[in-house]
Amino acid sequence: MMSNYGNMMDSPKSSPHGGGRSPVVARQDSSGTLKTTISLGKTPTIIHTGPFYSMKEPPAKAELTGDKDLMTEYGLHHTLTKFKEKKFKESLASFLQNIPGINDLITHPVENSTLRSVIEKPPIGGKELLPLTPVQLAGFRLHPGPLPEQYRTTYVTPARKHKNKHKKQKHKDGVTTGQESTLLDSAGLETYEKKHKKQKRHEDDKERKKRKKEKKRKKKNQSPEPGVGLLPGGASLGGAAGVMGATSLGSLGGGPGGPGLSSLSASMGPGVVGNMNSFSSSMQMQQQQQMPMQQQQMSSGGLLGSVLGTSGGPGGGGGGGGGGGGGVGGSLLMSQF
């Protein structure tokens, strides 16, 4: 026994300071272990106290357990049947306490006085429309007084966002905000650009028309007039025509430069000139339309006249009178060709 006691004293469980375990750590439950008391003295003795096995006393028997029906125990079946069969008519104020005004419209119960009863059992009528009774209309009555604050938020309409339109808004004070001023400036710039583009197009069209007119004027100035430009060439052609007429008539007569032929050429000259002068006015319009072709004809006519004038021969001296008179007529005839 003394050796066991020594072992118990040296064990870490028995010594509070020895061993690696802290005394704060909870130890295992020793309810099932053997309980002993040691008396120290001259003769130390170990006294066994308590039972060998730790056994708890069973709980006392309860009156109400889970196998019993509480409704029968307390007698609540009768009250349950009454609660099921009874129809409660609770007032409106019992579950809607925050609504202002008189909530209970009718204190005494009246049949067909609720809106539900009218919906479930509508009044039977014929084709005619019968008005509801005042008792039935009581279900549709609105209570006087303002709407409570807790329900006002549901009926508040959200503020509509103002869309910025590109229109000039006139203010009474004449003061425009920054956003409106920027909108006005942008709109003004757009209109100015559109007007500027239209103005440019108009100016371009005017310039094109002016250029066309100037080109036409230059062409008219460069081309010589029919009466003035044909005189030098016409004179040469007239002389050549006179030479040609004299030589041809002289050859037909059989002698160069005879007196009868010269008088014949002189008599033919004024008549041809008169006829050609009357015809020249109608031909001037055609000459203006065919200016480039006339210039080519004039150059070729002048060349022909110069050739004929130089190579006339003896016929030119014999037909002098006819050549003088037929100069203008020859020029007009050559202009036609």
Curated annotation (Swiss-Prot):
Keywords: Activator, Coiled coil, Nucleus, Transcription, Transcription regulation. Its main location: nucleus. The keyword Ribosomal protein does not apply. Residues 297-309 have a biased composition (Low complexity). One of its GO terms (molecular function) is DNA-binding transcription factor binding. It comes from the Eukaryota. The keyword Transcription applies. It is found in: Nucleus. Signal peptide: none annotated. InterPro entries: Mediator_Med19_met. Pfam families: Med19. Residues 28-38 have a biased composition (Polar residues). Component of the Mediator complex. PANTHER family: LUNG CANCER METASTASIS-RELATED LCMR1 PROTEIN, MEDIATOR OF RNA POLYMERASE II TRANSCRIPTION SUBUNIT 19. This is Mediator of RNA polymerase II transcription subunit 19. It comes from Drosophila melanogaster.
